From Swiss-Prot:
InterPro entries xrefs: bL21-like, bL21-like_sf, Ribosomal_bL21, Ribosomal_bL21_CS
Function description: This protein binds to 23S rRNA in the presence of protein L20.
NCBIfam families, sorted: L21 (TIGR00061)
TM region(s), chain numbering: none
Cellular component aspect of the GO annotation: cytoplasm; ribonucleoprotein complex; ribosome
Known partners and oligomeric status: Part of the 50S ribosomal subunit. Contacts protein L20.
Gene: rplU
tRNA-binding among keywords: no
Name of the featured protein: Large ribosomal subunit protein bL21
Assigned protein family: Belongs to the bacterial ribosomal protein bL21 family.
Keywords, alphabetical: Ribonucleoprotein, Ribosomal protein, RNA-binding, rRNA-binding
């Protein structure tokens, strides 16, 4: 069984036992998180939401809180010798999907 979950402005296809890297979620390591914005549930019978599947949820457990790899942002203006280099590390959460309720 799988589901399509919407979180952090993105959509993820998940199954039970999967590890998922998402935008930072509130909570400590070991806490459980429940997603109620389920767009689709698949398996023996596929249910597509309009836009959400009613009474469906996905439960996950927070495995790690941290930062992603550094992304370098380089800006320059032509013929002016103007350059700017910035670095950015996005906060992220790693989850383990425990249960899909359809």
């Amino acid at each position: 069984m799988y589901a399509v979950v919407k979180t952090g402005g993105k959509q993820y296809k998940v199954s039970e036992g999967d590890f998922l890297k998402v935008e930072k979620l509130e909570g400590a390591v070991g806490d459980t998180v429940e997603f109620s914005e389920i767009l689709m549930v698949g398996g023996d019978k596929v249910v597509i939401g309009t836009p959400l599947v009613p009474s469906a949820s996905v439960v996950g457990k927070i495995v790690e809180q941290g930062k992603d790899k550094k992304i370098l942002v380089f800006k320059s203006k032509r013929r002016k010798n103007t350059r700017k280099l910035n670095g950015h590390r996005q906060l992220r959460t790693i989850l383990k999907i425990e249960k899909i309720n359809a």
